[in-house]
């Protein structure tokens, strides 16, 4: 073979190698057009491993609220909105919002409805759509007391094949004193749980803790050993750290603190925890400002919540919190939180591992730092990680949904 031919072959090989090693296009956050339009807020994402649902509240007028949802299709777009309920006497709050959960094709949703003209009196109403049915069974009571007090901050999860496990903050012992009442005649906010059928009927309910923080979200998950509920506790010394209680062999354990932050604060920070489960793995995220150190923390448990590892921490005065978590497998997950820097306020997300490692921090999207933006949402389905939040556009709001490939984390 002559030298010219050898030279040509060599250059051809180099050319092909350079083509094969071309830099792939950059990974970017991808928008999913929202089907609900403007005047929408308070999104909630729900995945059962096969289907992703998005719920939200639409306010066509100042006095009317519509609870709606959509399904993510195989083509990656949202379906037309379907209505769950509508009302003019609802309690609609930026931190205490309606949501829905799935159980093998059956749906359970909930919203808050005022029980009196008072500011701090509202009830939790359930809406059930059993698999195969087309009409929602609505307006079903969750709690069995008739006190005109606060009931809210609901969380729920599929429990058995035929039931859901629901937890909530319950003000029946407060006497209607409002948030953080120190009136001598007012009792404390408590947390309760109930098992609810696919038809929306309460099977049993019980008190989990007689004294909790008044207005931080609860969070519920199901491990291989049973249900867990995570919430912000409140001690007699006003220490408000994150607690967990577990349903084991038919009995709830005494609440225990996940990590002793020692956050002493006289009022509610309106910044609750989030928990997710897979097998015996738990991942919990929460906000704290103990001793003036503002941070979000994330901790894994490998024994269904009996013990937790050292927290993975993101610290800084710009940390807002409003955490979200999702598991990728039994050793890793996605953590999300809100954070303000010199460029603005953003929803941030990163991969975290049970060994303590945190990966690249992704800037998912710009957010309003105030209450209007609500609490961002996170779910993993298939090879994508989905996010939702309320985008503030001047005087109006609109739900925004985006995704990143799971491989980006």
Model-derived features with residue positions:
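Sec-dependent N-terminal signal peptides
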Residues: 4-14
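Extracellular, repeat-based ectodomains that mediate carbohydrate processing or recognition
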Residues: 20-409
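C-terminal motif of bacterial Sec signal peptides marking the signal peptidase cleavage site
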Residues: 16-18
């Amino acid at each position: 073979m002559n030298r010219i031919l050898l030279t040509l072959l060599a250059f051809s090989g180099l050319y092909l190698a350079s083509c094969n090693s071309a830099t792939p296009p950059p990974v970017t956050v991808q928008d999913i057009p929202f089907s609900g339009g403007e005047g929408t807020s308070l999104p909630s994402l729900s995945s059962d491993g096969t289907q992703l649902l998005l719920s939200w509240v639409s306010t066509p007028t100042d006095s009317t609220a519509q609870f709606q949802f959509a399904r993510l299709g195989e083509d990656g777009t949202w379906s037309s909105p379907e209505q769950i309920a509508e009302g003019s006497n609802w309690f609609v709050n930026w931190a205490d919002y309606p949501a829905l959960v799935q159980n093998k094709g059956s749906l359970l949703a909930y919203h808050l409805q005022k029980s009196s003209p008072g500011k701090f009196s509202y009830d939790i109403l359930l809406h059930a759509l059993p698999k195969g049915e087309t009409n929602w069974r609505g307006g079903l009571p969750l709690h069995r007391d008739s006190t005109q007090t606060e009931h809210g901050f609901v969380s729920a999860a599929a429990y058995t094949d035929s039931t859901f496990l629901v937890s909530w903050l319950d003000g029946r012992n407060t006497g209607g004193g409002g948030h953080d009442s120190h009136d001598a005649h007012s009792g404390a906010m408590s947390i309760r749980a109930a098992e609810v059928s696919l038809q929306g009927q309460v099977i049993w309910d019980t008190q989990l803790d007689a004294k909790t923080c008044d207005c931080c979200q609860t969070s519920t998950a199901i491990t291989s050993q049973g249900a867990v509920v995570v919430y912000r506790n409140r001690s007699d010394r006003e220490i408000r750290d994150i607690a967990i209680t577990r349903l084991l062999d038919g009995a709830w354990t005494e609440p225990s603190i996940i990590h002793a932050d020692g956050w002493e604060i006289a009022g509610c920070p309106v910044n609750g925890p989030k928990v997710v489960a897979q097998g015996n793995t738990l991942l919990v995220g929460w906000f704290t400002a103990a001793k003036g150190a503002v941070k979000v923390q994330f901790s894994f448990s490998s024994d269904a919540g009996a013990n937790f590892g050292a927290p993975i921490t993101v610290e800084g005065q710009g940390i807002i919190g409003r955490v979200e978590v999702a598991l990728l497998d039994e050793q890793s997950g996605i953590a999300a939180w809100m954070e303000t820097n010199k460029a603005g306020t953003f929803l941030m997300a990163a991969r975290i591992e049970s060994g303590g490692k945190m990966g690249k921090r992704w800037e998912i999207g710009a957010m309003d730092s105030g209450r209007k933006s609500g609490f961002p949402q996170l779910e993993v389905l298939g090879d994508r990680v989905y996010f939702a939040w309320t985008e503030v556009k001047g005087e109006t709001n609109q739900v925004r949904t985006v995704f990143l490939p799971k491989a980006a984390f």
